[in-house]
UniProtKB/Swiss-Prot annotation:
InterPro entries: AB_hydrolase_fold, BD-FAE-like_dom, GDXG_lipolytic_enzyme, KFase_ver/fungi-typ. This is Kynurenine formamidase. The main chain amide nitrogen atoms of the second glycine and its adjacent residue in the HGGXW motif define the oxyanion hole, and stabilize the oxyanion that forms during the nucleophilic attack by the catalytic serine during substrate cleavage. Pfam families: BD-FAE. Belongs to the kynurenine formamidase family. Homodimer. The keyword Cytoplasm does not apply. It is an enzyme of class 3 (hydrolase). PANTHER family: AB HYDROLASE SUPERFAMILY PROTEIN C4A8.06C (PTHR48081), KYNURENINE FORMAMIDASE (PTHR48081:SF33). It comes from Candida albicans (strain SC5314 / ATCC MYA-2876).
Amino acid sequence: MEDISEEQEFKYGEHSLQKIKVFKYSSTNASTYIYIHGGAWRDPSNTFDEMRPVLGIPNANLIGINYRLSPEIKHPEHLIDILRALRFVKQNFDVSQITLLGHSVGATMILQLLHYRQIIRDGLKHTHKDDLSSLDNLFAYVNDNVLLSQVIFLDGIYDVVELLKEYPDYASFVDDAFVSNKHFADSTQLSSANESLDLPFSLVSKDTKFLIYQSLEDDLLSMKQTHLLIDYLSSKNQGFTLHVGNWGKHEEIFGKYREIVFSGNVP
């Protein structure tokens, strides 16, 4: 792929939302940042364009992922789209030192990716789509070709069961993305009873850095979800770095601090 200095969109599937946007790219760049937006699995106002304010990150490829939304699709179809997008990036661009960052349910999907085979398999059982044969090639390619140097969790949802205990009104968007209580309970490692989720993480190595950010001014998510993620990673002996600060409301996505946070630094 030739260098890209002005943003371009590329399709990784047939649906209008199955696209990535490349904001800048050069095969000589030392690192690559790939962003997964949030929006409660359903909000069309959240898109890959949330990456645009961080163009000042130096010597880096910057890519955002769009994916299909609920209620048109249910979990784990959003996650499958992310895998397809990652495969497209690796097949078409010379990228290394990949940082994958996600905001809100984008962070949820980064957590899910750590056990994507099990999470997707369990999710499809609930939507009566048990045939995984069509996904075998996708799984194999991602497993063999995608290695993340850094993952960044940004004001995320990590346990939907606990989320609804704290915010019962959020059932409206959860119901759009899932078909039952068991479906969303099985959707992340923190609430699932599937013993296969004790397997080692996928797509990362012992050298992968885990960064967690939480704005103390977030008006939609308290620190509880972040504490739950911290407890989970600690139980797996996975090291991480936690950063908290007064960095704006949830939909401001760190506001004037976005570029600093998205680059993995501290405002």
